[in-house]
Amino acid sequence: MDKKPLDTLISATGLWMSRTGMIHKIKHHEVSRSKIYIEMACGERLVVNNSRSSRTARALRHHKYRKTCRHCRVSDEDINNFLTKTSEEKTTVKVKVVSAPRVRKAMPKSVARAPKPLEATAQVPLSGSKPAPATPVSAPAQAPAPSTGSASATSASAQRMANSAAAPAAPVPTSAPALTKGQLDRLEGLLSPKDEISLDSEKPFRELESELLSRRKKDLKRIYAEERENYLGKLEREITKFFVDRGFLEIKSPILIPAEYVERMGINSDTELSKQVFRIDKNFCLRPMLAPNLYNYLRKLDRALPDPIKIFEIGPCYRKESDGKEHLEEFTMLNFCQMGSGCTRENLEAIITEFLNHLGIDFEIIGDSCMVYGNTLDVMHDDLELSSAVVGPVPLDREWGIDKPWIGAGFGLERLLKVMHGFKNIKRAARSESYYNGISTNL
């Protein structure tokens, strides 16, 4: 049987055992990546490693103790539950009832292949037997002879039919062949949100492609002559000015971070997010988020800067995503946070509202939860998540030496651009050689 870690044991018993073998009743405990923060009923507090092989873990597994804490008032029921060795793992078998589909009865091949008897087939007498008398069949009633007028009308109608058959048929217009999937993908890549061209039209592929190529070349020439700004870079500069003007300090932290930072964020090897980390070697990886470096900045700047501390960072992050319409493996994040006074949900929502109104984006804020921070506030545009926001403190803060209240949120810049410019695919807003400002460069 696998040795259960300490947090599992104390959660099951609700008890703690000291080095002297004294049992305490646990009033409250919190578990981080490697630590357990415990508060006893008697008021004693301690921080211990979440170990499988510590003395306390062994004692709890073996159900042995010497005495109880008189201030914790450990009940007899707690003691009995602790001493009773019951199996912690119970297996249940779920039976799913499935109705069998209706199956037609099988028919022998010889019968299935036999021709069906014709209803009007004449009966052939067998040799040596008398022929059966024929059943008299009544002759069909003879149609009355047409009158002279009707006969001439029939003759004229037949003449017209003969003349029409002799005349050559008018040519039938042929429609353009249906577009293949590859052709549709090519045309969709050339389309822009401003185009009013239907791919269901009867125009041939070459004609549609030629028209779209001409439009995209004109778009690139216009950008080169007038704007000369990349959407992503322009948005970064606009966001930087927004937060600097509101008293936030701009941060530029390393992209290559220790792998230990990821583990301290609660992303262990058995989590799904751990599989998405780009690892350089066993010691370093590309940052999947901005939070670890910002945690370190908050702790260090707290020694020098006045209250409250307000910082933000814009930079690339990397994850092995599905790379679909809403995810990228290389993406640009904005994280802003404030630590100290004024760190309330109302102030956080006020900053988010002012920021998105500045960009002209409609949104709504709803409650949610995530693996790293627990309870979060999700900022949504229709069914697209723009941001996850947090009101601290959270248990994870202790791993980074943070013991003050804080608020913060993270936005993906490519998602903001997707909404601002009406892109159907997030790749049009990303760092790419295939698109510039959402315009295909494969011309």
From Swiss-Prot:
Keywords (A to Z) from UniProt: Aminoacyl-tRNA synthetase, ATP-binding, Cytoplasm, Ligase, Nucleotide-binding, Protein biosynthesis
This entry carries the following GO cellular component terms, namely: cytoplasm
Its domain of life reads Archaea
Please state the Enzyme Commission number of this protein.
6.1.1.26
Q: Annotated Gene Ontology MF terms?
A: asparagine-tRNA ligase activity; ATP binding; pyrrolysyl-tRNA synthetase activity; tRNA binding
Q: Which reaction is catalysed here?
A: tRNA(Pyl) + L-pyrrolysine + ATP = L-pyrrolysyl-tRNA(Pyl) + AMP + diphosphate
Renumbered to this chain, region (Disordered) spans: 103-177
Q: Name one GO biological process term.
A: asparaginyl-tRNA aminoacylation
> Which Pfam families does the record associate with it?
tRNA-synt_2d
Bias (Low complexity) ranges: 131-177
Q: Which InterPro entries match?
A: aa-tRNA-synth_II, aa-tRNA-synth_II/BPL/LPL, Phenylalanyl-tRNA_Synthase, Pyrrolysyl-tRNA_ligase, Pyrrolysyl-tRNA_ligase_C, Pyrrolysyl-tRNA_ligase_N
Asked if Electron transport is a keyword of the record, the answer is no
Q: Which HAMAP family match?
A: Pyl_tRNA_synth (MF_01573)
Q: What does this protein's UniProt record list under function?
A: Catalyzes the attachment of pyrrolysine to tRNA(Pyl). Pyrrolysine is a lysine derivative encoded by the termination codon UAG.
Protein name per the record: Pyrrolysine--tRNA ligase
Q: Which organism is it from?
A: Methanosarcina acetivorans (strain ATCC 35395 / DSM 2834 / JCM 12185 / C2A)
